[in-house]
Amino acid sequence: MKAVYPGSFDPITYGHLDIVNRALKIFEELWIVVMSNPRKSPVFTVEERVEMISDLVKKEPNVHVDSYQGLLVDYLRSRNIKVVIRGLRAVTDFQYELEMAIANKSMCKEFETVFLMTDERFSFLSSGLVREVASMGGDVTKWVPPNVAEALEKLRSKGKQFML
């Protein structure tokens, strides 16, 4: 069975990768889909995020990385995928994710959302926190893979403003 793990991944963190690894224990094939979110001002372009994630999962033959702008249900239909994976850190995540799952289900009854609890080591971690700490020159290497930490430092050294 195939599943989609959608998100903005701006940037991808070890918390996201924990969800990827655990989803692979349940599903035969996983599509990580970088979604364009009009409510967010990303630090990295969609293409940069796809490239960073692709580098991280290149040794996983059953993981594919893609991008999409539009409704998630349309992407699922186009790939004939019926399951969405969502990671949860806390109760506050659950409220938002539940609303999204219900909205997706109302648009297409055949789709299911599977919630995976984030490992407790990453329960505090968010892309926003990573961006905030990195923008001030802080060490984020415990929270993101080396290629992501390097990309963040490169942006900071060029004076790019990180939107929080």
From Swiss-Prot:
The keyword Transmembrane helix does not apply. One of its GO terms (biological process) is coenzyme A biosynthetic process. It is found in: Cytoplasm. It comes from the Bacteria. Its cofactor is Mg(2+). GO terms for molecular function: ATP binding; pantetheine-phosphate adenylyltransferase activity. Pathway: Cofactor biosynthesis; coenzyme A biosynthesis; CoA from (R)-pantothenate: step 4/5. NCBIfam families: coaD_prev_kdtB, cyt_tran_rel. This is Phosphopantetheine adenylyltransferase. It comes from Pseudothermotoga lettingae (strain ATCC BAA-301 / DSM 14385 / NBRC 107922 / TMO) (Thermotoga lettingae). The lineage of its organism: Bacteria, Thermotogati, Thermotogota, Thermotogae, Thermotogales.
